[in-house]
Amino acid sequence: MVRVIAMDGPSGSGKSTVAKIVAEKLGWFYLNTGAMYRAVGLFLADRNIPCDENAVTGNILKQADVDFDPDGHIVLNGNDISDRILTPEAARHASDYSKLPAVRKLMTALQRKIGLSRPSVVEGRDIGTVVFPDADHKFFIVASPKERARRRFLQLKEKDPGTAITIEEILKQQNERDSQDQKRALAPLKQAEDAILVDTTEKTIDEVVEEILARL
């Protein structure tokens, strides 16, 4: 049976970085489901499709070809959008459109297909609760709101040194997104009962990786 490690948590908690390194150390595939939702969100927003379940249909979603290239970069309809999905705009669209049943259904099916094709470290917001409830190992990665905003700010500044966004603005957007993710009726962000809680606020990446590997 294909093995799966599930890592959930809010954006900026460090789960993406940690999941990727853990996957590399194990020689497993790294599946970033948040990137997939951001890709679909951008696809729909670019086409000015309302965030409404009557507007976002299966036929429209079939036009969004979401995949990963050999280097693990997210690809939408043949275009590498790895940089674009890091923007606050992409995060907002992902949170909005992910509330729609048609989007969740398509993404969940695609994530299961990819994740079960080989041993995988899968990270997102509902992996241990919805996508892979029977995962071999589950971790819920968190960090303080201020630390998460600081990390996102540094990430954006690295990509675009001239960006005008402030940490305060990122924190405000982040809090709004967290509230949406936690309160949505469909697959809300929450810790699975059998998931191990890992707080990365005052830990280095290496410390978190070693902590997780020690628990496998």
What is the meaning of each model-derived region?
Residues 5-7:
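Hydrophobic anchor at the beta1->P-loop junction of P-loop NTPases
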Residues 25-88:
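N-terminal phosphate/diphosphate-binding loop that engages ATP/GTP or pyrophosphate donors
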Residues 82-159:
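ATP-dependent NMP and nucleoside kinases share a basic, alpha-helical "lid"
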Residues 138-141, 145-146, 152-156, 194-197, ...:
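Glycine-rich phosphate-binding loops of nucleotide-dependent enzymes
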Residues 60, 111-118, 125, 129-130, ...:
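Small-molecule kinase domains that catalyze NTP-dependent phosphoryl transfer to phosphate-bearing small molecules
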Residues 12-13:
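ATP-binding Walker
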Residues 16:
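Walker A/P-loop
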